[in-house]
């Protein structure tokens, strides 16, 4: 008799996803981040659900309700800090996952890559709206500054911003709708993840060498299930170290001050995982130009497959491209640092140079490096 997991309609789907899936035999730890992202998403949905049971999305009570969760709700503090630091872990895994895709040429699987970009944008939107909910100073002013960027859109900008706010400033209507969106979007993300996997399993996974692994596949279970469990344990270890020992390490102290529309904080900045994009936004002394650069800093990923000039898929055997990739990684760290600094000399100049370098590497240097490497190999 055939095993039930191979014939039952529901078990068959899970079997083809997680058990009998043919996987390349040589995928490294960089391929662990997909499963880690799934773990992060599940964790965020669960902790978020329990937080939503005690949170109130009203300007007069939002801040107090978060305080109430931390002080009075049974293990509320751990749920709150797992959710806040879970977002940081989520973005670390996201950036590693995208970086892996860039390094090993996984963007040649264009459908999977494009759904991935949509996923990235959706998760960023979700995180931004979540940051507004505690209704601290940085929540309020972050929401004001970022939503105000839409006013740079010619002709309809101001109307659009006031439509999103639900009034003439960030207020109760804004908070309520942000809570509604923050609650629903993770489920949209879950649906997109299914589409992401659907497209991935149409072609099969890439591998570090960049060549087809059809002739050498192994079953996902037990080889990669055990590997994913190890990755998950490490992820949870790092998360719990953060939560237990320094839960506010990655947060902003200003968010422990209740939102006050009459007092602007000296340095308005988003969470650390948006600082690179914020630095690019600030590096252009023109509102519309800054907004376009901010959008392009993420949307540039969509044209990466078109800029691929090398005859090899990944960067494993391409030293010039490798150097450029790690220069890009260092540049992103520099931008992240600059985004958290005040707008004054020398940070303005460093930010502008780092922003120019970011776009130059992706749009100019990497395609040129691919051509040079082809010529070196006489291809």
Swiss-Prot record:
Compartments, as annotated in UniProt = Mitochondrion inner membrane
Residues the entry annotates as binding heme b b562? 83, 182
Q: Which CDD domains does this entry report, sorted A to Z?
A: cytochrome_b_C, Cytochrome_b_N
Q: GO CC: one term?
A: mitochondrial inner membrane
How many cofactors are bound and how? Binds 2 heme b groups non-covalently.
Q: For binding a ubiquinone, which residues are annotated in this chain's numbering?
A: 201
The UniProt entry, under InterPro entries, shows: Cyt_b/b6_C, Cyt_b/b6_C_sf, Cyt_b/b6_N, Cytb/b6-like_sf, Cytochrome_b, Cytochrome_b_C_euk/bac, Cytochrome_b_N_euk/bac, Di-haem_cyt_TM
Q: Is this entry keyworded Metal-binding?
A: yes
So where does heme b b566 get bound?
Answer: 97, 196
Which domain of life, per UniProt? Answer: Eukaryota
Which cofactors does this gene product need? heme b
Q: Does the keyword Heme apply?
A: yes
The membrane topology of this protein is: Multi-pass membrane protein
What keywords are annotated for this sequence in UniProt? Electron transport, Heme, Iron, Membrane, Metal-binding, Mitochondrion, Mitochondrion inner membrane, Respiratory chain, Transmembrane, Transmembrane helix, Transport, Ubiquinone
Cited Gene3D superfamilies: Cytochrome Bc1 Complex, Chain C (1.20.810.10)
- Which Gene Ontology BP terms does the record give? mitochondrial electron transport, ubiquinol to cytochrome c
Location, primary (coarse class)? mitochondrion
Transmembrane parts of this sequence: 33-53, 77-98, 113-133, 178-198, 226-246, 288-308, 320-340, 347-367
Q: Which molecular-function annotations from GO does this UniProt entry contain?
A: metal ion binding; ubiquinol-cytochrome-c reductase activity
Q: Could you give the subunit structure recorded for this chain?
A: The cytochrome bc1 complex contains 11 subunits: 3 respiratory subunits (MT-CYB, CYC1 and UQCRFS1), 2 core proteins (UQCRC1 and UQCRC2) and 6 low-molecular weight proteins (UQCRH/QCR6, UQCRB/QCR7, UQCRQ/QCR8, UQCR10/QCR9, UQCR11/QCR10 and a cleavage product of UQCRFS1). This cytochrome bc1 complex then forms a dimer.
Other remarks? Heme 1 (or BL or b562) is low-potential and absorbs at about 562 nm, and heme 2 (or BH or b566) is high-potential and absorbs at about 566 nm.
**Biological function:** Component of the ubiquinol-cytochrome c reductase complex (complex III or cytochrome b-c1 complex) that is part of the mitochondrial respiratory chain. The b-c1 complex mediates electron transfer from ubiquinol to cytochrome c. Contributes to the generation of a proton gradient across the mitochondrial membrane that is then used for ATP synthesis.
Family membership noted in the UniProt record? Belongs to the cytochrome b family.
Which named protein is this? Cytochrome b
